[in-house]
Amino acid sequence: MAKDKTKKKNKTLKKIILAVVITLLGTLLIVAGVFLGKILKLRSDAKKIMSNVSLDSFRQTETSIIYDKNGKEISALSGIKELYYLESDEIPDVLKKMFVQIEDKDFYNHSGIDMSAIIRAALANVTHASIKQGASTITQQLAKNMFLDQSITWNRKITEMFIAMELEKRFSKDQILEFYINNIYFANGYYGIEAASEGYFG
């Protein structure tokens, strides 16, 4: 009699454990499905943003220079941005190296995102339950500055990563660095190193 009761208890316990395991697995699958769906949606959004991007997208608001018949500058008409665009070969190598050294030492080795930096930042952010530390590469910064807002959210960050990877597929490293240097905001309405030097130093 006692053995029968023990067997029944064991069977009941096994059923409870099995039910709990199935429930947990089901919950995990649902969460994983929702998460995957969200990631795929953000990836799709990034591709849509990039669908109409061309070389002109990075210089379309540059300042127009007006010259007289002798080639002397007589006026500068600002676009939406105060931006004087420099081609890659017009940007000093020392300046390029400086930006890479300061902003993204592995710029020439990654494909738009730096996974080791992302993992390091993710651990710090999870600890604080919010985005406290960034891991943005030069390409990601370009993606954010050109195509996204400045909000600090996971959605924006993930979209930024997808856009960065698309940029790396479409443009060379030299082009990306050129776009970046020409579109950095230096305050007072100046975008890019040339506009900043013209504005601050004349």
Would you name each region that the model predicts?
Residues 2-202:
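Juxtamembrane regions of bacterial inner-membrane/periplasmic proteins
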